[in-house]
């Protein structure tokens, strides 16, 4: 999701067989994005505590106690490595690693999420080679942690579709070259990786390859009129299922696995029904859908309409009971 983070901080063919994955009784991945380290994107590198923050690990443990098992941790590439193929900012890396380790030490999954929309310093990433090197360097830091998941880049948009394919493949190649061979890789698509527009925009991503066969296609789906996730109203009680229908068939037709990496709805009865519609559709097709992650928790959301931050976030108090039915 694209938000004004500075403001927020202040206020039909034969289906192929999908790769098999051992599941929990419910979703394999069910969790929350933990926003903060990507805030203040207009201030690079920015000041920790002023322009951006890191998730509160105690809040994460609270969410784990409620039944969430997956936490997507967004960060900015430019803060981690001021030059794409250069060295790390050690302070930023230390803070990121600390959050990742807190999640995985608790037995949950930690998604390392480059929240850059296919850009670096505001410019579209055009060098697949540099992107591969960047991911090789980053993945090497987490190669021994089997509970880490790599998210290639958040919400590519307004980019050449072949470039999106090439960047995703470069990320996969770099991650595996780093010796990170046990982890899942979440790949994202163009047009903000929307599930409802996936078949129109991202069909070519079916050609991505991974020697470990651990690619998961991450799609995002909001339930408001324009699918942007910027309104607290939802189109209808059934819009969730409707918006993932074509993507579900694409996964089945191509023998792929998917996850909804962002979803949300407002604190009202129509949205609660719409969220249930979405999650029920994913559960009914759990041969291809591995789960979903709420947008979002994080310590700086204050009165944000989708905040899952314990213990007084609007979604934490108003939507958690709906989500608990899908936990284990």
Curated annotation (Swiss-Prot):
The identity of this protein, by name, is Endo-beta-1,4-glucanase B
Which parts pass through the membrane?
none
Spell out the family assignment given in the record's similarity comment.
Belongs to the glycosyl hydrolase 5 (cellulase A) family.
Q: By which gene is this protein encoded?
A: eglB
Q: Which residues are glycosylated?
A: 95
**Catalytic residues identified in the record:** 155 (proton donor), 262 (nucleophile)
- What taxonomic classification does the UniProt entry list for its organism? Eukaryota, Fungi, Dikarya, Ascomycota, Pezizomycotina
Q: Where in the cell is it found?
A: Secreted
Q: What does this protein do?
A: Has endoglucanase activity on substrates containing beta-1,4 glycosidic bonds, like in carboxymethylcellulose (CMC), hydroxyethylcellulose (HEC) and beta-glucan. Involved in the degradation of complex natural cellulosic substrates.
What Gene Ontology molecular function terms does this protein carry?
Answer: cellulase activity
